[in-house]
């Protein structure tokens, strides 16, 4: 039996690296597209890499870019994938306000380029296509919780670009018979999450503060409510969506909601820190109420370690996101296995280990840059 061949865009990111691991364990030959830069930026997949001169190499990287249609067509022609997972994107909401045109080129037109390459190469009957969509499509939410039929109301250039990608995926499915589907992903995290995303900013920042590398964590909207899951659970669902008889779009979520404030509190407790939130709005702060154990030697009772900086507010806020994963459970039998508490514990432990290493370097006179935007 021939191995299935998968092509992943965004393979060096959080989801791409977990998906690559998952598919390799299932016996796939996995190809990934990465952008060329002066740095390799492959740390999330380095453990999967093998010398291409060896026999039976099942993991291969290709230089490519979602803004280059000829490049994408060449890679697809060479790889002839059974499954394409489009996880590559400019995925930071705040950055999309600063670089809206680039975000549209990558996230919207990049998806079109992949679908058109599949059509142009005559792969419409061979290749299945998964599009990583986003809960940001719901934006100014029209109903709670959000499900597959909830109307979209995007509130950022990122979300608008992703809405085009969502509909062009459906259009190519209906127009050309491509097995193409959207996974509407709610927030999903892990120790591999980018350091500028809110959850990783929190766990990394709290660990750094605990070790004396930072004084205070500056945040935006503490009242924002999100549905957070673990990326490992979500990439399994992405794979399951391409194993069905017919393509269908699904919400991928936990169905449970927490505030940014609660995520901060949970992260602090993993370090033995009890916080008290005082003040309101831009004047809200988190004060250390007690410290237990040895994980936070640099912190004392009364320290202010979290504050609000209005610079981190979005031009158009998304106040609440809560997904309804009941269709995925009913049709595919998918349920998330990792709880938020387990995920927070894993993320804090990983960031604490790094912070302790940086603190040791600093103690011995080395310069350590731990700034978080």
Swiss-Prot record:
GO terms for biological process: 'de novo' GDP-L-fucose biosynthetic process. Gene3D superfamilies: NAD(P)-binding Rossmann-like Domain, UDP-galactose 4-epimerase, domain 1. Keywords: Lyase, NADP. The active site is at 134, 136 (nucleophile), 158 (nucleophile). Its cofactor is NADP(+). GO terms for molecular function: GDP-mannose 4,6-dehydratase activity; NADP+ binding. It comes from the Bacteria. Its EC number is 4.2.1.47. It catalyses: GDP-alpha-D-mannose = GDP-4-dehydro-alpha-D-rhamnose + H2O. The keyword NADP applies. Catalyzes the conversion of GDP-D-mannose to GDP-4-dehydro-6-deoxy-D-mannose. Belongs to the NAD(P)-dependent epimerase/dehydratase family. GDP-mannose 4,6-dehydratase subfamily. PANTHER family: GDP-MANNOSE 4,6 DEHYDRATASE (PTHR43715:SF1), GDP-MANNOSE 4,6-DEHYDRATASE (PTHR43715). This is GDP-mannose 4,6-dehydratase. It comes from Vibrio cholerae serotype O1 (strain ATCC 39315 / El Tor Inaba N16961). The gene is gmd.
């Amino acid at each position: 039996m021939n191995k299935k061949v998968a092509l992943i865009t965004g393979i060096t990111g959080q989801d791409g690296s977990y998906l690559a691991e998952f598919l390799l364990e299932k016996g796939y030959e996995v190809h990934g597209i990465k952008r060329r830069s002066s740095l390799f930026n492959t740390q999330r997949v380095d453990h999967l890499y093998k010398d291409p001169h060896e026999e039976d190499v099942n993991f291969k990287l290709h230089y490519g870019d979602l803004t280059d249609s000829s490049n994408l067509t060449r890679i697809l022609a060479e790889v002839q994938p059974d499954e394409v997972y489009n996880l590559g994107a400019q995925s930071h909401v705040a950055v999309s306000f600063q670089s809206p045109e680039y975000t549209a080129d990558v996230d919207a037109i990049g998806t079109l380029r992949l679908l058109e390459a599949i059509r142009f190469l005559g792969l419409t009957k061979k290749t299945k296509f998964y599009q990583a969509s986003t809960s940001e499509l719901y934006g100014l939410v029209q109903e709670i919780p959000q499900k597959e039929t909830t109307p979209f109301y995007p509130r950022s250039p990122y979300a608008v670009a992703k809405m085009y990608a969502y509909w062009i995926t459906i259009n190519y499915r209906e127009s050309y018979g491509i097995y193409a589907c959207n996974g509407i992903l709610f927030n999903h995290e892990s120790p591999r999450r980018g350091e500028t995303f809110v959850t990783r900013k929190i766990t990394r920042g709290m660990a750094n503060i605990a070790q004396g590398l930072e004084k205070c964590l500056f945040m935006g909207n503490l009242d924002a409510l999100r549905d957070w899951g673990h990326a490992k659970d979500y990439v399994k669902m992405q794979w399951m969506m391409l194993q069905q008889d017919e393509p269908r779009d699904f919400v991928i979520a936990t169905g449970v909601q927490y505030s940014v404030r609660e995520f901060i509190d949970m992260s602090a407790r993993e370090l033995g820190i009890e916080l008290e939130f005082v003040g309101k709005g831009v004047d809200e702060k988190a004060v250390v109420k007690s410290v237990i154990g040895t994980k936070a030697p640099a912190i004392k009772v009364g320290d202010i370690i979290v504050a609000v900086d209005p610079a981190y507010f979005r031009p158009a806020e998304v106040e609440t996101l809560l997904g309804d994963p009941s269709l995925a459970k009913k049709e595919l039998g998918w349920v998330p296995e990792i709880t938020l508490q387990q995920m927070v514990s894993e993320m804090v432990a990983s960031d604490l280990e790094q912070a302790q290493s940086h603190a040791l370097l600093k103690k011995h006179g080395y310069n350590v840059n731990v700034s978080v935007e």
